[in-house]
C-alpha cells in the first residue's frame, strides 16, 4: 500500500487556512429575514387574481369594442351586386286601375314666378336614423328583459280590459326594446283593440321583419291585412275624388296666385327637409329679387337657385313632352339643375365612389347605372302604368333613394321625380312639409324593412292636403267674385302668365 507523501504546498495551504481572519465580505449571513423568498404569500396571490379578473372583465372588452368600431368605420371593400330592387307593388290598389289618360293639353300646376331673367349661377346627408349606441341600447339584455316583463304586465291589463294602463306600460316597453318581436306583437294587439288597425298591422309587419318565422305575428297579420287593404283603397279613392273635383273647377285669379305661392312653398320645403336653414320669406326674396341673405351660406343660396332651375325644367320641358316615358337623361337633367350651382362638378353625374347613409349602404358605384336602368324600365313598363299614380310615384321615389345614384341631391331629385309622375296624372304638385321630416325618414326606414305602405300613405296624405289647399283657394275666390263681380287677372299677373307660356313653348 502506497502512502502519499506530504508536500510543502500542502503545509502552506494548511497554515494559510488556519491563520486567515474571518472577513465580513466572506461570511454568509444566514438571516432568515434577508433570505430570498421561496414562494408568494396567499394575500399576494389573491390580489393578483382580483386585478387580472378586473382587467379581463372591463379593459379587454373595452379594447375589443374600440377595435371593432374602428374596423367597422373604416372604408369597406366593394360588395357583390345586390339582388334586384323589383318590388311587389300591388299591395294597396288591389284591382289594377286603368292607365290614367290626361287631357289633350297637359296641365302645368307650377307657375314660375320669375320673369324672363335667368339665374346665372348643397351636399346634405340623410340623417342617421339610429346610431351604434342606439343599437347597443336596444340589444341590452337587461333592458330587453325589463321590456318583456313590462309587456307581460301590459298583456294582463289588456285581458282585464284596462287598455289605457296597458298602453302606458307598452310605451315604456317600446322605449326599452323597440325591435323586439314580442314587444311589437303585444303593442299591435293593444292598438288593434283601440281600433287602430293600420298601426296594429304595422307592428306585426315590423315583428316579422325582425323574426320572419314568428307564428303569432303571421296569424295576427293575416287577420289585419284585408282590413288594412280596404282602408288603403278607400284612402286612395278619396284622393282621386278630390283630384277630379279640382280638375273640374274653373281656373281663376286665385288659382294663379295659389300656383305662385305653391312654387315658393315647394322650393322652401324640399331644400329645408335636407337641412337648408333659409326661411320661407328668405327663399322667396332670393327667387323674386336675387337678394343675398346676410348670415346664410352661399351653398344654401345655391340650393334654392338650383331647385328653381330644376322646377322650371320639370314644368316647361318634362311636362310638355309628347310622350310620357321617363328616361335616364331626364333624371340626370333634373339632378344637373338641382346641383348646378351648389356643386357643378357632381351635377348630373353618376357617382363613382361608395356612399354610406346611416346604417344603410347603397349599391357599389359599378352597379349604379344598371340599377338606374332597372328603375327606368320599371317606370315605362306597361304593367307599371296601370298602378295607381300615387303608389307609382311613391315607389319611384323610394327606388331612386334606394339606389342613391348621386353623391348629393338624391332626395331632392327623388321628390322631383315623384311630382313629375303625379302631375302627369292630373295631380297638383305634392309638398312634403319640413315639419314632417321625421315621419318622412321613418317611413323610408320602414320601407327598407320591406313595407312600402307607410310611405305611400304619407305621400297620399300630403297629396290630399295639397289639393285641399287649391280647392280652398278657388272656393274662396268664387265667393269673392260673387261679391265683387271681378274675375280678371291683374295686368302684372297677365304679363307674367304670357311670359311663362312663351317660355314653355320655347322649351326653356
From Swiss-Prot:
* Residues annotated to bind ATP: 274, 357-360, 408-415, 440-441, 448
- O-AMP-threonine is carried by which residues? 352, 476
Region described as Disordered: spans on this chain: 482-508
Query: What is annotated as the active site?
Result: 404
Please report the stretch or stretches of sequence annotated as the Fido domain. 326-461
Q: Which residues cross the membrane?
A: 44-64
Q: Which PANTHER family match?
A: FIDO DOMAIN-CONTAINING PROTEIN DDB_G0283145 (PTHR13504), PROTEIN ADENYLYLTRANSFERASE FICD (PTHR13504:SF34)
- Write the protein's name: Protein adenylyltransferase fic-1
Q: Which gene encodes it?
A: fic-1
